Amino acid sequence: MATVLGSSNKIYTAYYYDIKGRVAKTVQSNLLGGYDVTATIYTFTDKPATVTHTHTASGKPTRTEMYTYSYNHADRLLKVEHTLGGTKITLADYAYDNLGRLQSKSLHGSATNKLTYAYNVRSWLTGISGSKFTQNLYYNTGNGTACYTGNISSMTWKAGNESTIRGYKFTYDGLSRLMNATYGETAGINTNTNRFSENVTAY
C-alpha cells in the first residue's frame, strides 16, 4: 500500500506467484477508479514469454496491451512484439553470431533502423554501425595510447547525416583508472580539440 503524496488516497498492490515462486500477476488500484493488472507467462527456463498489461478506469473502456518475447535454442532474445487493440507490431529483432555475440538489432522491422555490431578476437566490442549512428572503439589500435587490458584507448562516432566525425582519446593511471578524456574531431581526433574534454582530478 502507498499513500498519494498530498492526499489521503491510497494505492493498493497485490502480488500473485506461481508454483516456482515467480511473480505471475500484479494487481494495483489506480486513481481513476480502476485497476492496472500485469500478468506474466514464463518459458521453461524462467524467461518472460508474454507480459500482458490491462488498464481499467471508471467509465472508460478497458485497454490491454501485450509484449511477446521469442528466444533461440540458447535462450538469447530473438524478437520483441507488441500488441495493442488487436494490432501486432515488431519492436525489435536480434541476430547473433556463432559465438553467441549480438550481431545485429533491427527496430520496428525496418532495415533502415538496423544496427550491426563488430568485435575483435577477444570479443571486445569494436564497432556499432547503422544508418542513424556509427561508433568505433579502439583498444590497442587507433589514435590513443594503446591499451591491452580491455580499456578503450579512443573512440569515434558520427550521428545521423552529420559529416563530422567526433571522438575522444582516453588516458589511464597505473591502476587502469580513467584520468583524461580528450575531445577531438575528424578521424584523427586532432581537430577542434579540448572543446568537451574531461579530467579526473583525484581518486
List each model region and its residues.
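Acidic/glycine-rich beta-solenoid
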Residues: 1-203
